[in-house]
Design a protein with these regions (language model features):
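Flexible, acidic/Gly-rich N-terminal and inter-domain linker regions that tether
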Residues: 1-48, 345, 350, 358-366, ...
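Structural preference for beta-strand elements that scaffold enzyme active sites
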Residues: 2-4, 82-86, 112-114, 139-141, ...
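Core AdoMet radical
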Residues: 4, 10, 26-102, 106-124, ...
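Active-site beta-loop-alpha junctions enriched in small/polar residues
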Residues: 10, 90-92, 118-122, 145-147, ...
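Alpha-helix-loop-beta-strand connector modules within alpha/beta enzyme cores
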Residues: 99-115, 162-176, 229-253
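Catalytic cores of alpha/beta
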Residues: 124-131, 185-203
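Conserved strand-turn element in the central/C-terminal portion of the radical SAM core barrel
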Residues: 149, 167-192, 214-215
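Auxiliary Fe-S-binding modules of radical SAM enzymes
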Residues: 201-415
């Protein structure tokens, strides 16, 4: 079982400055977006205001983080399996000034540590990587961008790229390194990407996550900061998915992508794919009638599942937003209500106030019932790289059962 150790930190401040491609760069002050956690009669709460910008918490003292770890351990004492501590935060954990002290304290509990996110910008000397591993760090998620000193200086804004790359190599050789690269067309794709993959493969890295660069609102920049980099046009979903497939075939390390996909196990939405119909028998019967509103990427997969189980009382509408969790009020306002049934299911984590979205779906004079579905319906490539197909399938079945529960509850047909 993983215990999250949140060390805090603010993007751009506690990471030695924004990476050139960072989706928090150029963020403008925004009104609260609204979400499921807002009070009933007002828009705005900690999650959909400072929470989404991750501006609320400075780096915490290590003793406070240790207290939180101890509390989590006590609360979960009866659970099976060993504990492992995932150190993460709003900044770059390698920039956390008390990182070695924290890891040492975790090690004294007899626990291993996972550095949940780092670009290595806080590592000025690769000896730090060796010390961290000696103190029990056995897993690292490392944003590499490219095995290229010049590109890391320019795009990651890394003051010591040589030390960072040497640290990544040490982590790969002596622990479990899960690398990541935001792909900027014309910058770190093509031969640069292949050189990076060759390095990771020779070092012994476990996996590489390719992340499509978000540079428009539709791609997920919902904080008023699009474009992050002028003049860069990101790949289409189809082009990016093809790139992930291609790189995965060429190298021995596991290559996944976000927002799509994981070719090794055919994720996400494994149960929607041809040849996997056997898993659909574990879904509940659909007795309600509803419209599911989701993202452009998820819509065809979700639609395929309901078509295969014969749920003709359910239709699926995809908005222009690529990622369902980043849908906002404007995405729902763009929907043609003539295609919407009397009950509507929206993504659980979408950023819109419950009352606001009810008003949006009733603006044509039809009073519709709006409910939220599960937070996720599958597993993103960021997480699936450490999972088997069976583990992802189990999560999908559980999530679709929850979605059908929501349809049957909110879309109960009148007798």
């Amino acid at each position: 079982m993983q215990i999250v150790a949140d060390v805090g930190g603010i993007p751009g401040k506690d990471c030695r400055g924004y990476c050139k491609y960072c989706y928090f760069r150029k963020v403008k002050p925004i009104e609260p977006l609204g979400c499921r956690y807002c009070p009933p009669n007002s828009v705005g709460c900690a999650r959909c205001s400072e929470g989404i910008c991750e501006t609320g918490t400075e780096f915490k003292p290590s003793f406070l983080v240790m207290n939180e770890i101890q509390t989590s351990m006590m609360m979960n004492q009866g659970l099976n399996g060993e504990f492992k501590v995932n150190i993460s935060g709003g900044g770059d954990v390698s920039c956390y000034p008390q990182l070695e002290e924290l890891v040492s304290g975790i090690n004294q509990f007899g626990l291993k540590s996972h550095l949940g996110y780092t670009s290595g910008k806080g590592i000025d000397d690769s000896e730090m990587a060796s010390r961290l591993m000696n103190l029990g760090v056995d897993e690292v998620t490392f944003t590499l961008f490219a095995d290229d000193i010049g590109l890391r200086k320019e795009w990651v804004k890394d003051p010591t790229p040589e030390a960072s790359l040497e640290s990544a190599k040490l982590f790969a050789e002596n622990a479990n390194l899960y690398a990541a690269s935001v792909i900027i067309p014309g910058v770190n794709d093509g031969e640069v990407l292949r050189k990076t993959c060759e390095s990771l493969e020779s070092w012994g890295a476990k996996a590489l996550l390719l992340m499509r660069f978000a540079n428009t609102t539709e791609q997920g920049l919902i904080l008023g900061n699009a474009p992050v980099v002028d003049g860069i046009e990101s790949q289409s979903i189809e082009e990016f998915s093809s790139l992930v497939d291609e790189i995965n075939k060429e190298y021995s390390l596991r290559v996944t992508g976000t927002p799509l996909g994981d070719p090794t196990i055919n994720a996400p939405f494994i149960i929607s794919k041809e040849g996997n119909e056997e898993y659909l028998q574990f879904l509940k019967e659909v007795t309600g009638e509803a419209t599911i509103v989701t993202s452009k990427i998820a819509a065809p997969f979700i639609s395929a599942v309901f078509k295969k189980i014969g749920a003709n009382t359910v239709n699926v509408i995809g908005t222009n937003k690529d990622i369902a969790c980043l849908m906002t009020r404007e995405d729902f306002e763009s929907i043609d209500l003539s295609n919407v049934k009397d009950s509507v299911i929206i993504p659980g984590r979408s950023f819109v106030h419950d009352k606001v979205v009810e008003d949006i779906f009733s603006r044509d004079g039809v009073e519709r019932v709006v409910g939220r579905g599960p937070d996720t319906l599958s597993v993103d490539g960021e997480l699936s790289s450490g999972m088997t197909d069976e583990e992802v399938i189990m999560e999908e079945i559980e999530s679709f059962r929850d979605l059908i529960d929501a349809i049957n509850f909110f879309g109960m047909r009148k007798v």
